């Protein structure tokens, strides 16, 4: 179907978001058309502000308004423990449980040869540099319990073992194939308390 160019561009833009197909993108585009102009301007500003005002922490890779992030700046944190997660949503899930008091390292993905994503395409090199520079005693691998997460955890474990740092994995109880961000706080808390050495 042929749409006016502004609608077509908006549909194409919405389709760049994960999980948004052509029908959903079309529905969203027409919803925007029906919105009040002030709401549309506010929505567009929020999109632009996210890109302009947020950056990634130079230490851990977590999203932040200031560098380093509030977690890396917190002197009360246990700097001898780093929890490695796949993305920012995992940090937020871990912080909600209020049990973990160490630092984080965000990979921004996982190793997935089928998708052409190798170790050099995610935040692994900066993790290794960080481990050489800091007094880290334990590295907790909190990858999602799926094939990509397991592959990433095994790869990091093999890289880190020779450095002499204890590498642990979250305890099972997280459903295989699930995402860490969707685990409830009790399950996540038990997984961190029952972590095992790799």
Swiss-Prot record:
PROSITE patterns: RECR (PS01300), TOPRIM (PS50880). Keywords: DNA damage, DNA recombination, DNA repair, Metal-binding, Zinc, Zinc-finger. Transmembrane segments: none annotated. A zinc finger (C4-type) spans 57-72. It holds the Pfam family RecR_C. NCBIfam families: recR. This is Recombination protein RecR. The lineage of its organism: Bacteria, Bacillati, Bacillota, Bacilli, Bacillales.
């Amino acid at each position: 179907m042929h749409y006016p160019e502004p609608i077509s561009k908006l549909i194409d833009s919405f389709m760049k978001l994960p999980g948004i197909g052509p029908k959903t993108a079309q529905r969203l585009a027409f919803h925007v058309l029906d919105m009040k102009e002030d709401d549309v301007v506010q929505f567009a500003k929020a999109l632009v502000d996210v890109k302009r005002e947020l950056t990634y922490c130079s230490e851990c890779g977590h999203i932040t308004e200031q560098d380093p992030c509030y977690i890396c700046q917190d002197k009360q944190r246990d700097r001898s423990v780093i929890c490695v997660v796949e993305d920012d949503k995992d940090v937020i899930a871990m912080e909600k449980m209020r049990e973990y008091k160490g630092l984080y390292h965000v990979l921004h993905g996982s190793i997935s040869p089928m998708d052409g994503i190798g170790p050099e395409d995610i935040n692994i090199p900066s993790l290794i540099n960080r481990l050489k520079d800091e007094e880290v005693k334990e590295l907790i691998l909190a990858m999602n319990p799926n094939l990509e997460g397991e592959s990433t955890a095994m790869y990091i474990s093999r890289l880190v073992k020779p450095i002499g740092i204890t590498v642990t994995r979250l305890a099972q109880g997280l459903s295989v194939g699930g995402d860490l961000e969707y685990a409830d706080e009790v399950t996540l808390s038990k997984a961190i308390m029952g972590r095992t050495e790799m």
